[in-house]
């Protein structure tokens, strides 16, 4: 009897051939060049102070904080969505389906509903930021830990329950919003729209290391994600505990989505948009090739939208207008091409 060598997750090949690898490198370098160009443009364009003066660098420094926020948001959405697609075996859904945005809206609406206009101030600050993050992570973790712990439930059941619970939270939020004073509602609306200006720079020293740690963990476990993408039976035969690995990845996804949603507000289609484009550009199932492309696409999209809105339409920070428009169109195109969810 001939013994065969055990198959491992590291036996997969990232690229088909040298041409495939070269095309991926060209796309990666091109995105890096575009990203750097947009960073320079956002920092220097329309700066009223002479180049090199103290005033010029003070203005540039204030703009750098927005660039850092966009980098954090792009990384969180890109890595979370790609990982979420892997464990759910569905490239149409997004992590928002677990109810992060609905819960974020409920928390902020309840604060304004109970405390009035002062509630918008209460929801800002380090303590409030981490409170929202903890609530979102706990909600998502309890949801899929409970549903995936039973042999009678699966990922699809978890997604359906998430949709129903998200709809319920959104209905409660809408009910409270209808009872608000018009002025209070205007204040609340500005908070509920994904906006780079919503981010408080005092959150960054906490958000950056947490997001970076989770992102590094996902990169380090890229081979395991490659195995998970092959399905439960195959990943189990490769020596992985499929259910445990799925829960670990979902915990990482929930942390990333909670951090970015609490930081800038909801951006429903950002992750879906960059992940869909990354799959087409990378043209591989290797997460080590997909992750950097997805992150750079997200960063280019955010910085490009920020530049256009800031210097053409003078609507600083409201990048969700462009992101949701493009993302929604791409979503419809993908649905029409596939003909199913």
Residue ranges and their predicted role:
Residues 1-341:
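Alpha-helical transmembrane segments in inner-membrane proteins
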């Amino acid at each position: 009897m001939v013994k065969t060598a055990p198959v491992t997750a590291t036996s997969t090949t990232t690229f088909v051939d040298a041409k495939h690898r070269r095309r991926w490198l060209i796309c990666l370098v091109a995105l890096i060049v575009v990203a750097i160009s947009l960073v320079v443009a956002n920092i220097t364009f329309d700066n009223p102070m002479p180049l090199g003066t103290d005033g010029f660098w003070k203005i540039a420094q204030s703009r750098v904080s927005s660039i850092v926020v966009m980098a954090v948001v792009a990384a969180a959405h890109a890595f979370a969505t790609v990982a979420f697609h892997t464990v759910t075996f569905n490239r149409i859904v997004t992590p928002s389906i677990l109810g992060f945005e609905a819960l974020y809206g409920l928390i902020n609406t309840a604060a304004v509903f109970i405390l009035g206009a002062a509630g918008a101030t209460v929801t800002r600050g380090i303590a409030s930021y981490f409170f929202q993050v903890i609530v979102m992570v706990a909600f998502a973790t309890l949801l899929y830990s409970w549903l995936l712990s039973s042999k009678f439930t699966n990922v699809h059941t978890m997604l359906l329950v998430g949709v129903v619970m998200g709809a319920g939270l959104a209905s409660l939020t809408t009910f409270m919003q209808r009872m608000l004073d018009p002025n209070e509602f205007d204040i609340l609306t500005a908070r509920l729209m994904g906006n780079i200006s919503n981010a408080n720079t005092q959150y960054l020293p906490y958000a950056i290391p947490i997001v970076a740690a989770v992102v590094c963990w996902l990169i380090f476990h890229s081979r395991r994600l490659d195995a998970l993408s092959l399905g439960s039976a195959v990943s189990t035969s490769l020596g992985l505990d499929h259910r445990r690995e799925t829960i670990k990845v979902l915990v990482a996804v929930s942390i990333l989505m909670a951090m970015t949603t609490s930081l800038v507000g909801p951006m429903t289609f950002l992750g879906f948009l960059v992940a869909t484009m990354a799959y087409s550009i990378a043209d591989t199932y290797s997460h080590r090739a997909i992750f950097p492309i997805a992150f750079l696409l997200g960063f280019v999209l955010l910085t490009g939208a920020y530049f256009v809105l800031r210097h053409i339409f003078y609507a600083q920070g409201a990048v969700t207008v462009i992101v949701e428009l493009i993302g929604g169109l791409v979503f419809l195109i993908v649905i029409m091409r596939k003909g199913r969810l």
